[in-house]
């Protein structure tokens, strides 16, 4: 039955790649930058704000892109120099099709990016997968980071049953499902996934869904996305997190079904001195659901530091 359903989905929904040139023509703007890193990586990032301002680097989550932070950039652009980048397999970043999404590799990717740009010490915020990469980078290269903001960050494994997850997550748990997802125009699955991610469904607009779907159809992206190893993202442990030196703010929504609020509380409890904010009636993406409030809390935290 599963095989028949997946075969039908592939036949009905398969969609071709969208060339990078077309995506860049549509989405690039005055803030668009690119830098090349070893391993065939052509990294897209956006840089906004005056160079004299404190530096804030933003990391998106799995399947997302730099655009997830649009609301924060609007709110914080006059207070911070902001750099937001696309991970391999995401957004406008080009990567070899055999790139494997692992937490440790992504942390080293961000470190290499920071070294290439010769960035000074910076504050780092990460959403979901990007949150896991953020705390892993802070452990591996503590001298780079002066503050951490973990937004519904992966860290400790959930205890929830897979049945509670949206269909896209359930399909991706099976090898055959991942093969199907590599080849389809997954717009309807993305709509399902994003609406499950948030409490306020109205924030998931057709334009947002279209953007996710178009970026994921960049050459090689769907293959890279299906390579993700969640065990390298949900691998936090209290003894290891004790070594985190950076002041840390943990943000979560009480209606998050992707990273359970209990996991966020556990993460905050394990990090020395971490502050925790739990938003009522908010899901997995507070930077999209409540951009003004979450950005204000982020700014207050960063500005409270000496």
What does each model-found stretch correspond to?
Residues 38-39, 46-48, 87-125:
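Active-site loop/oxyanion-hole signature of alpha/beta-hydrolase fold enzymes
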Residues 139, 148-178:
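Flexible "cap/lid" loop of the alpha/beta hydrolase fold
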Residues 15-16, 22-23, 161-165, 181-242:
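Conserved alpha/beta-hydrolase catalytic His-Asp/Glu region
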Residues 244, 250-252:
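Short beta-strand/loop motif that positions the catalytic acidic residue
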Residues 274-306:
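Catalytic active-site module of serine/aspartate enzymes centered on a nucleophile-bearing elbow/loop
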Residues 48-92:
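Conserved HGGG/HGGXW glycine-rich cap/lid loop of the alpha/beta-hydrolase fold
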Residues 255-259:
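Acidic catalytic loop of the alpha/beta-hydrolase fold
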Residues 1-54, 79-80, 120, 303-306:
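Alpha/beta-hydrolase fold catalytic core
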């Amino acid at each position: 039955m599963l095989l028949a359903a997946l075969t039908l989905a592939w036949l009905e929904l398969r969609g071709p790649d969208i060339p990078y040139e077309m995506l860049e023509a549509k989405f690039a703007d005055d803030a668009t930058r690119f830098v090349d890193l070893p391993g065939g990586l052509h990294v897209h990032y956006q840089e906004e704000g005056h160079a004299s301002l404190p530096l804030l680097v933003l990391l998106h989550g799995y399947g997302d892109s730099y655009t997830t932070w649009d609301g924060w950039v609007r709110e914080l652009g006059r207070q911070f120099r902001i750099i937001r980048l696309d991970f391999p397999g995401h957004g406008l970043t080009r990567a070899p099709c055999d790139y494997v999404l692992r937490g440790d590799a992504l942390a080293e990717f961000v470190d290499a990016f920071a070294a290439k740009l010769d960035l000074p010490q910076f504050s780092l915020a990460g959403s979901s997968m990007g949150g896991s990469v953020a705390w892993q980078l802070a452990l591996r290269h503590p001298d780079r980071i002066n503050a951490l903001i973990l937004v519904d960050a992966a860290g400790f494994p959930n205890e929830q049953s897979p049945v509670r997850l949206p269909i896209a997550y359930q399909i991706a748990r099976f090898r055959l499902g991942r093969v199907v997802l590599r080849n389809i125009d997954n717009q309807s699955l993305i709509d399902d996934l994003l609406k499950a991610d948030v409490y306020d469904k109205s924030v998931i607009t057709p334009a947002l869904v279209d953007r996710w779907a178009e970026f994921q159809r960049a050459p090689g992206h769907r293959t890279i996305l299906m390579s993700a190893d969640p065990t390298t993202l949900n691998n936090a442990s209290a003894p290891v997190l004790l070594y985190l030196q950076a002041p840390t703010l943990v943000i979560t929504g009480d209606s998050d079904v992707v990273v359970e609020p209990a996991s966020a509380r556990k993460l905050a409890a394990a990090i020395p001195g971490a502050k925790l904010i739990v938003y009522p009636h908010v899901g997995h993406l507070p930077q999209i659901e409540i951009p003004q409030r979450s950005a204000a809390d982020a700014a207050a935290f960063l500005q409270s530091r000496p």
